């Protein structure tokens, strides 16, 4: 688990949720640091809040992550969580260290449940075997997947 300023996290990929009708705290921080780029790209359709829509950007302004992976959350339903998270991780595959901001994705769910589900999906992604018939020979899976813990969820670190 990692904490601190999400904009200063040096990682291969930062997976950020985009709910319908608003922004998560991490998306807001990225929007502010980039002088409104996130909001403009949502309006332009480059980033879409529909469930399962993914947009990947390299060298995002104001962020130290190599890539920022925006994942559409729709109306933030628990039933979509695993599928959406898997899409985010699959699109962050080139990042050797991936940071998930999933504790912000479902504000009405218990943070411990979100952390447990995130861990399950992350372990599945790290353990999947390389199948060179299916994937390109240069395909690289993440070496490490961390859960970002915002300050208001510090008690989740203990769980």
For the regions a protein language model found, what residue spans apply to each?
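Glycine-/small-residue-enriched capping loops at alpha/beta junctions
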Residues: 1-159
